[in-house]
Amino acid sequence: MGLFEFLKKKEPPKPAAGPRPMLRPMGGGLPPHPEPKAENNFIIAILDSCRFDSFMTAAPKTMMKLGPVEKRYTYASWTAPSHYNLLTGLLPHTSPPNVYASEYYKEDFFNYNSRLGTKGIEFGKMVPTLWFPGLLRNTLGYSTHARVSLPVLNPKTGINRDFDSFTLMDHHNDMRAMLPTMKFDTARPSFYMLNIGETHYPYAKPNEDSSMWPRISGVNGVFKKMDEAVGPDGQLIKDQTQFFDHEKLEQLRARQIDAVRYLDDVFQELFDLVPKNTHIVITADHGELFGEMGYFGHGPIMHEKCFEVPYLEGKIR
């Protein structure tokens, strides 16, 4: 049984339907919020590219106030598909042996009842969209928001659906700038997805001089420069940049660890900001390679370190 079959409820046969209703045009207004059916605000804080052992080496004291840290595994090896997957409601998994995927999905979804502070969530209403922000907003009455650091997740992409606000931050590495934009309404719970870029290459804190960073493009940058990468003869012009040596790779690994330690102070500010009934998940969208088996980064890589991520959740008060 796949995810779609699990969520879909079997119903008795219905009489033949009339003409299909016109769908709401893309980019049109969202429907009104229903009355809220949950008590907890819910935040998913995604440390982009943060591999599990980097997090554990950093030993962030503030973040660990949420609860024990688990090693989990992401469903994808790079940012865009991993965030799409997170927004279906599937969090990084534990890779349990001798368990059917359908049984794992059921338990994962059932746990949202306690995360959101409600009972009997009607997951069947996620069919056919399979979109968790839609369930949160249009069934449970949440206000839904996203703050993203990486341009590959910008508001023009397909994941900007059923969000009341969706903002690409001015800088890719400044979680602290997200905090003043986060508002919590006493009339209804809020959902925030935070894509946090300090742990993404080049693992930079916001006060660093960007002119000193080496430049390696992600998918967004590749698209921007693709026309320049094709010569007049129609052949692809390959970049001759030399691969990082061991010393540089170790420096980059240390930078990611340092970024986690820096973010720990910012998370204290987040914890001070959120209201009492706020359930927070801290995790990553994928891991990162620092020279293992000749790999660097993430994306077209099949290696366990590209999928191992930290996972912790709970209420701060």
Where are these regions (language model features)?
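Catalytic domains that recognize anionic headgroups
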Residues: M1-R317
